[in-house]
């Protein structure tokens, strides 16, 4: 039996036994293990750098306030923590420090309001931004007021302003596209999210930042798995979804260990 058919059978079995997330974790972790290759210990982020990751609930993931981070983990339980663990375990000599400044419910408007205190005042060497999901979601969630919706023009102009304000003060910047865990590209929410993602792609090219195309990463997996294996509401991620985000980020910053 060839490898592809074997994986298909394993996937179907995992769906029945509720182990889809474990399967995805194993399959997406595998590329980081290069048996027989020398340990190269490389990553685009410079040694002794501070990497700040800012965004909404996808970044937040239960992080606690800086006031008590000395006694408890302040990176949350999502993709930020996974990235931290991978770098710490395999590139310890790099001494890369990570800061999580995600806040659940945030839009680009909220980021702009707290940019000085949560980004500029902290003087990070590297900055990663994942924002846009909550800007779109109010259009499709009856529980959210219409005024929470952020138009694509406001989203684009505000994000560009933040990039222009910050790029000269950091060594590197990473832009992550918003996403929708939906394989049907004609779905209204997916289609709108793609347009906001296009804004991020355009700005990443214009300002020569690193781009993490999260939607492309999810789309690759969605050819083999159901959306519910990654998220129940097409936004908030199960552990396997966070693993995909972490892998996409590490690939974009040329992580190799």
PLM region spans:
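Short coil-to-helix leader/linker segments, especially the first N-terminal amphipathic alpha-helix
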Residues: 2-44
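A polyanion-binding, active-site-adjacent surface
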Residues: 100
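Short glycine-rich His-centered loop
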Residues: 35-73
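Alpha-helical cap/lid subdomain in secreted, periplasmic
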Residues: 34, 40-47, 77-78, 82-97, ...
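Compositionally biased, intrinsically disordered low-complexity segments
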Residues: 12-13, 57, 67, 247
